[in-house]
Design a protein with these regions (language model features):
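Periplasmic/cell-envelope proteins involved in peptidoglycan metabolism and beta-lactam response
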Residues: 1-293, 315, 398-408, 450, ...
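Intrinsically disordered, low-complexity charged/polar segments
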Residues: 489-493, 600-609
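Beta-lactam-recognizing serine transpeptidase/beta-lactamase-like catalytic domain environment
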Residues: 216-221, 225-231, 269-321, 325-573, ...
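Short acidic/His-enriched helical or mixed secondary-structure segments at domain edges of catalytic enzymes
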Residues: 208, 540-543, 607-610
Length: 658
């Protein structure tokens, strides 16, 4: 019995020993083959992988003027595996001028996978970005006391000008979504957020380099691993040359002070955008440094939406500028001829429907209808097109033919400009009206679209592109703001001609109408210019005051610039649109404004539209008025007080003064 018990114990003890050895073998296998934590730990003690950031590409205007460049900056990086429990937190915070609460929160955020998806305790993580030179100097002197913390040299953007914020855009620290979308980025990297900085991010950013450095047992750098055999040099980003003319852009922004709206100028011969103004705007120089987030938050909360690029994101009724597209459609489709005349008795009257018009001679033909901007002419044209049964089976077919013309002119779809956020506008089709009117509609139902009202909306860019298309007599290039990318050919999408459905003859008559408008019609303010300008006004109806719109180009027979101006609540097209458009033409073609032009520009710059007391410019005006009123009140009160004081009375002769 005792022998059996002894044998039993021996097996039990042996089994336990085998189990223990098996566990150790499995654990060893897991550590060595299944997990690389120990390898990473060993490597992190022996090597330091240092990322070298490339210089981001510079940005120039079309004349070679520097717009955006780089400036040295310093970031504090931390390797958590080295820093844990090895620094004096108070001394560290004092060296950087931060609070202990900030230090604790920042360290927690770094280790939070939700906020920092690429976190690893063995690699460098961003602790603090964009130190000033003074902060860097103070920290560098004491850095040896803070193991695990390193200084990373990089560059940040600087903007040479206060103009062109919506074109240039800005850069900011990557978000978790950016990191997830592109594994090139790591926490703390920078990425283009708006404008060309975003659209051309891959061209501008370059390629990161890397240095592998050797460290001793105390973590001190001993030099490059294998003399840099495994290092990779950073590749600088490519420079961009914009199509923007800085002087023209600056003039446009000056003219739009105190107004909401947009100016877009295009070179019809290339599709290059010469100027793109969106008002109100902001100074791009406030979107750099550690205050960027705060300033961006303030701008995004601003009721007047200064971050919105109205040139490509604003969808507006084009008003009477749209009549040019209708003339092209009616003529090409044979609905009208140059001699076709329609009645206008202060408007369009048909079967109880009335669309108003201003007073002018009637009946009126095509060229004069464009020159005087007759509403009735274009309403009659659409009415007869929708009702023409010799050409179209029904209004449904006629409507879709009409829409095909509009789409061929670049309406209803994104033009494809090289900026993020472009909107497509709205061009209705027959299906749209069938849905909304349950199949019960005709030419009278939709007649307002013929004069750029109703459901039709365009962006200012699309209106300017219409001007460029007319200037070219029937084709356009995709508008673009980048003229050249360093060492790269221009994208073929920007060199391809897009032809419209309208014929050349119809364009010649529309040009004649726009030239007549500039000489004696609604755009006659352009007649002062020393070159042949062509234009078309628009007064787009609105719930409040009408919008002031202009579209034109110059010179007539060798077009160099096409312009669209849109001023919200500006009233008649001739009030704001025409003078601003004329000044933009004059500046670009002549290189400067004449004395008369300068006087007009000065007057236009200081004209304000009453959007409300909180609109930029209105605040200063209201504050000045309030200050003047207070001063006047104080002066009146002082005078009243003086009047109430007893006046001295001279003693009469013989009386003794008391």
């Amino acid at each position: 019995m005792s022998r059996y018990t002894l044998e039993n114990r021996r097996f039990v003890i042996g089994g336990v020993a085998v189990a223990i050895v098996t566990v150790y073998i499995i654990r060893l296998f897991t550590l060595q083959l299944m997990s690389d934590d120990y390898k990473k730990n060993a490597d992190s003690n022996a090597f330091l992988k240092k990322v070298e950031f490339p210089s981001r590409g510079a940005i120039y205007d079309r004349n070679g003027q520097l717009l955006v460049y780089n400036q040295p900056a310093y970031d504090i990086m931390v390797v958590m595996n080295e820093a844990k429990g090895r620094i004096d937190t108070t001394e560290f915070c004092n060296a950087l001028g931060i609070t202990k609460e900030f230090f604790i929160k920042r360290m927690d955020d770094i280790k939070n996978y939700a906020k920092n998806p690429g976190y690893s305790r063995f690699t460098q993580q961003l602790f603090m970005s964009q130190l000033s030179n003074e902060e860097f100097s103070n920290f560098q002197e004491k850095m040896f006391r803070f193991p695990g913390f390193y200084v990373q040299h990089r560059s940040i953007r600087q903007y040479q000008t206060s103009c062109g914020a919506h074109i240039l855009g800005d850069v900011a620290e990557v978000s978790p979504a950016d990191i997830e979308e592109d594994d090139y980025y790591q926490p703390g990297d920078y990425i283009g957020k708006l404008g060309v900085e975003k659209y051309y991010e891959k061209e501008l950013r370059g390629e990161k380099g890397v240095q592998i450095l050797l460290r001793d047992a105390r973590g001190r750098i001993q030099g490059k691993y294998m003399d840099g055999a495994y290092d990779r040099q950073p590749v600088a980003g490519k420079d961009l040359t914009l199509s923007i003319d800085l002087k023209l852009q600056a003039l446009g922004e000056r003219l739009m002070e105190g107004k909401i709206g947009s100016i877009v100028a295009i070179d019809p011969q290339t599709g290059e955008v010469l100027a793109m103004v969106s008002a109100p705007s902001y100074d791009p120089r406030i979107m750099v440094g550690r205050s960027r987030s705060k300033n961006h938050r303030l701008l995004s909360r601003d009721a007047w939406k200064p971050l919105l690029n109205r040139s490509i994101m604003g969808m507006y009724p084009p008003g009477s500028t749209f009549k040019t597209s209708q003339a092209l459609t009616y003529m090409t489709e044979g609905i009208v001829t140059p001699g076709t005349a329609f009645p206008c008795h202060r408007g369009f009257y048909c079967r109880g429907l009335h669309v108003g018009c201003h007073s002018h001679a009637a009946p009126i033909s095509l060229v004069d209808a464009i020159s005087t901007s007759c509403n009735a002419y274009f309403c009659w044209g659409l009415y007869y097109m929708m009702g023409n049964r010799s050409k179209y089976k029904n209004p449904f077919e006629a409507m879709n033919v009409w829409r095909d013309y509009m789409v061929s002119m670049g309406f209803g779809y994104k033009l494809g400009i090289d900026l993020p956020g472009e909107k497509r506008g709205m061009i209705p089709n027959a299906e749209y009206y069938d849905r909304n009117y349950r199949g019960s509609w005709n030419g009278l139902t939709i007649v307002s679209i013929s004069i750029g009202q109703g459901e039709v909306t365009l962006t200012p860019l699309q209106i300017a592109n219409l001007g460029a298309t007319i200037a070219n007599r029937g084709y356009y290039y995709t508008p673009h703001v980048v003229r050249k990318v360093q060492d790269m050919p221009l994208d073929t999408a920007f060199t391809h001609r897009h032809f419209t459905k309208a014929n050349r003859r119809s364009y010649d008559y529309v040009v004649a109408g726009m030239r007549s408008s500039a000489m004696k019609g609604t755009c006659r303010a352009l007649s002062r210019l020393p070159f042949e300008a062509c234009g078309k006004t628009g007064t787009a109806q609105n719930h409040g005051r009408d919008h002031s719109v202009f579209m034109g180009f110059a010179p007539m027979n060798n077009p160099k610039i096409a312009v669209a101006v849109y001023v919200e609540n500006g009233g008649w097209g001739a009030d704001y649109g025409v003078p601003i458009g004329g000044l933009m033409m004059e500046q670009y073609i002549n290189g400067k404004l004449s004395p008369a032009g300068e006087a007009i520009a000065g007057s236009m710059q200081h004209r304000r539209i009453g959007y409300g007391p909180r609109f930029p410019g209105q605040e200063r005006k209201a504050a000045a008025a309030k200050k003047a009123a207070a001063a006047k009140k104080a002066k009146t009160a002082k005078q009243s007080e003086a009047d109430q004081q007893p006046k001295p009375v001279e003693a009469k002769s013989g009386e003794q003064q008391q």
